[in-house]
From Swiss-Prot:
Record's function text: Cell wall formation.
GO biological process, one term: regulation of cell shape
Reaction(s) the record says it catalyses: UDP-N-acetyl-alpha-D-muramate + L-alanine + ATP = UDP-N-acetyl-alpha-D-muramoyl-L-alanine + ADP + phosphate + H(+)
UniProtKB keywords: ATP-binding, Cell cycle, Cell division, Cell shape, Cell wall biogenesis/degradation, Cytoplasm, Ligase, Nucleotide-binding, Peptidoglycan synthesis
Annotated protein name in UniProt: UDP-N-acetylmuramate--L-alanine ligase
Coiled coil spans: none
Involved pathway(s): Cell wall biogenesis; peptidoglycan biosynthesis
Gene Ontology MF term list: ATP binding; UDP-N-acetylmuramate-L-alanine ligase activity
Xref: PANTHER family: UDP-N-ACETYLMURAMATE--L-ALANINE LIGASE, UDP-N-ACETYLMURAMATE--L-ALANINE LIGASE-RELATED
Places the protein is found: Cytoplasm
Species whose genome carries this gene: Desulfosudis oleivorans (strain DSM 6200 / JCM 39069 / Hxd3)
Length: 457
């Protein structure tokens, strides 16, 4: 990058997406500072790497910065953003900074409504196993290294794209993976057609020598296939896909499947992370590995031994015979897939879910879908909505979600007002042998930790 932009300031530096970029820039030798509303293990890590972190937002904090980076979660009237504009300091979205980093290497970008983080981690594992030493920027912490960013010395960078505000159109990846398209981020996109159009534009940005890797099992994505202008590889369970998973079978807490590449069976994989939905994510990583010339044996080893990502069907611990699991899923499609994965991984156990809806806008737009997403759990505890900076919407709250789920026939639904009430209620109902699953993109994971520690807050 042009070194006249040497000091980079991040507003909301503790976010999982922002912190990864900040860590890469620190490792590249840039001066990095930023602010967040609270201290966390993420901000502590950045401080340890040489970053300067402020807690709370104040226009004085940006002093000396050459550029200010913001995420879509930062309000336009944020005092640091206002101070930067008044001082003539460029204010750019997170995606624009990531796009600059991607220009340094051959980029492999993973996009899609669901499964991005898991797929990105799998692609990174495959390249790492193949000796390619990739740089990685991911939307979750890799369990193997405890961070969401790695500065490698190889020629490739693997990154997760955020389509929520259309900013992924700033990328021109050498390899673009699209896992699926769904009704998501309807606070930005008017409808599914607009979302599909945006993904097609993303694929159009692939250079002439690049390739698209797309899932043929997803109907909206399948509809785009005839419109893709660049070379592409399809994957999925469909017999029409270039790369197929066949004979999918749960075995010893894993998922075994056969991999078929253009009618040639390459072998089997015992996937190291649970859930049938992860088979498709793994196929995307297989496709990328094959495209880069890696042997199937190398790809197989990577996918069978990978540790996974924090907050993706993550087993947190066990207490009193209750296994506590946490997952980031917050969209109805993700919730259904996660519950299916839990049922497959822990057969014949009672599943107790604590769900924290995320954002008022998402809850309103997908309300009917949420009411039908929890049939595979035995007991459901619903929390108030995690606002994520949004203002409340009349008639949209956690209690209405619980009532809607109950109205659709679920007999084990309970609404609670907060963390302490949730933990107290769980103490009453949990039984030896249960699976306790915390679900949501907010701070619902804290409830699982409270249960494990025996604390009520």
């Amino acid at each position: 990058m042009y070194l006249k932009a040497y000091h980079i300031y991040f507003v909301g530096i503790g976010g999982i997406g922002m912190s990864g970029i900040a860590e890469l820039l620190l490792n590249l030798g840039y001066t990095v500072s930023g602010s967040d509303i609270r201290q966390s293990d993420i901000t502590d890590r950045l401080t340890g790497l040489g970053g300067k972190i402020f807690y709370g937002h104040d226009g004085k904090n940006i002093g000396g910065a050459d550029v200010v980076v913001v995420s879509s979660a930062i309000a336009a009237d944020n005092p640091e953003v206002a101070a930067a504009r008044e001082a003539g300091i460029p204010v750019i979205p997170r995606a624009e900074m990531l796009a600059e980093i991607l220009r340094l290497k051959y980029s492999i970008v993973i996009a899609g409504a669901h499964g991005k983080t898991s797929t990105t981690s799998m692609v990174a594992s495959v390249l790492g196993q193949g000796g390619m030493d990739p740089t990685v920027v991911i939307g979750g912490k890799l369990k193997s290294i405890g961070t969401n960013a790695v500065l490698g010395h190889g020629d490739y960078i693997v990154a997760e794209a955020d389509e929520s505000d259309g900013s992924f159109l700033k990328f021109s990846p050498s390899i673009a993976v699209v896992t699926n398209i769904d009704r998501e981020h309807l606070d930005f996109y008017p409808d599914l057609a607009a979302i599909s159009k945006s993904f097609l534009e993303f694929l159009d940005r692939i250079p002439f020598y690049g390739v698209a890797v797309v899932c043929l099992d997803n109907e909206p994505l399948q509809a785009l296939v005839p419109l893709i202008k660049k070379r592409f590889i399809t994957y999925g369970t469909s017999n029409q896909a270039d790369l197929q998973a066949r004979h999918i079978t749960p075995i010893n807490g894993k998922v075994r499947f056969s991999v078929v590449w253009r009618q040639e069976e390459l072998g089997t994989i015992d996937l190291g992370v649970p859930g049938f939905h992860n088979v498709r994510n793994a196929l995307a990583a297989v496709a990328v590995g094959l495209e880069l010339g890696l042997a199937f044996a190398v790809i197989k080893e990577a996918l069978e031994t990978m540790a996974g990502v924090q907050r993706r069907l993550e087993k947190k611990g066990e207490t009193g015979g209750v296994i506590v699991v946490d997952d980031y899923g917050h969209h109805p499609t993700e919730i259904k897939a996660t519950l299916q994965g839990v049922r497959q991984h822990w057969e014949d156990r009672r599943v107790v879910v604590v769900f924290q809806p995320h954002r008022y806008s998402r809850t309103k737009a997908l309300f009917d879908d949420f009411t039908r997403a929890f049939y595979q759990c035995d007991e459901l505890v619903v929390l108030p909505i995690y606002a994520a900076g949004e203002h409340p919407i009349d008639g949209v709250d956690g209690e209405s979600v619980a009532e809607g789920i109950r109205a659709h026939g679920h007999k084990g639904v309970r609404y609670v007002e907060g963390r302490a009430e949730a933990v107290a209620y769980l103490k009453e109902i949990l039984q030896k042998g249960d699976i306790l699953l915390t679900l949501g993109a907010g701070d619902v994971w804290r409830i699982g930790e409270d249960v494990l520690s025996g604390q009520e807050r």
